[in-house]
Every structure is written in C-alpha cells, then in structure tokens.
Amino acid sequence: MKNGIAIRHITQGGVIAAAYAVLTLILYPIAFGPVQCRLSEALTVLPVFTPSAIWGLTLGCVISNFVAVITGNTIAGVWDILFGSLATGVAAVCTYFTRKIRFKGLPILSMVFPVVLNALVVGAELTIVEKGFLDWSLFAFNALSVGAGQAVACFAGGLLLFKAVEKTKLGTLL
C-alpha cells in the first residue's frame, strides 16, 4: 500500500510540475521581467489539496526558469532558477501549512505567501540584475509590479481554481 501512495504522490507532483512549466512557457512574454503575470501561479493553490504540489510547483518553476535562461527569455538568469524557484517552494510550504485557515470558505491566507514571497524575492533579484545593487526605489517598483501580477494570478486565478477543484470534488482525488 505504501508503494501505491508513493507512486500517487510522484505522479501528482509530476503532473503539477509539467502543468506549471507549460503554462509559464506558453505565455513567456508575460511570465518574465519586471512587469509579469505568470498565470501558472494560479496553481500555487494546489498545496491546499496535496503536499505533492509543494515539490511539483518548485520543480515546475525550476524547469520554466531553466528553459527561460537557456533560450534568453529572462534578464534574471541563473538567479531566477535559484532564488525564484526557492521562493516558489517556500511559498508552497507556507500554503500547505495554512491550508485549513479559511475566510468565508476560501484559503485567502494561503494565497498571500506566493504573492509576498515572489514580490520580495523576484523584485530583489530583478533589481540587483538591473542595477548591480539593491536600489530601493527600483526594488519598490519591481516588487510592486511582480506582486501585482502575482496577486492577479493567485487571488483571481488561484481562488477560481480552488472553487473549481472543490466543486468538482477533484480535491478528494488529490
């Protein structure tokens, strides 16, 4: 029985990683840079349903950031592979641990972590790549613009996905 559970978690995480990477790369013109909105970030709600989403989201982010680096579609380069993916992974862990805190039935707090962590981390990495140091006014712009895109993806897309998964009972399969 334990092998069946392990296979299920590997499969779930792999499907989530693939979905994240594909959604990011299909829409790469709006997925990278100071003004960005990764629609794949709507998937950051999935740790509410399964811990497999933690590593799935992180791996999907690594894959999409790696492909963006080797194709020259990101200014953040290797830093985004390391720190952007780390921010996604930490946010996924936080989402998982706050999954039971609900406001009017919605995991609002769980969606705050991907927004704030990515705004701060990606905002800082973009600023350092652009300026060579942490210029606070540029950081504020980058963090706010990344955060705005994240907020759209997480609060609009993520919460819609949450309701769809919950309504269709797909969450019981995760």
What are these regions (language model features)?
Residues 2-55, 59:
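Hydrophobic transmembrane alpha-helices
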Residues 29-34, 42, 62-85, 89-90, ...:
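Membrane-embedded alpha-helical hairpins and interfacial helices in multi-pass inner-membrane proteins
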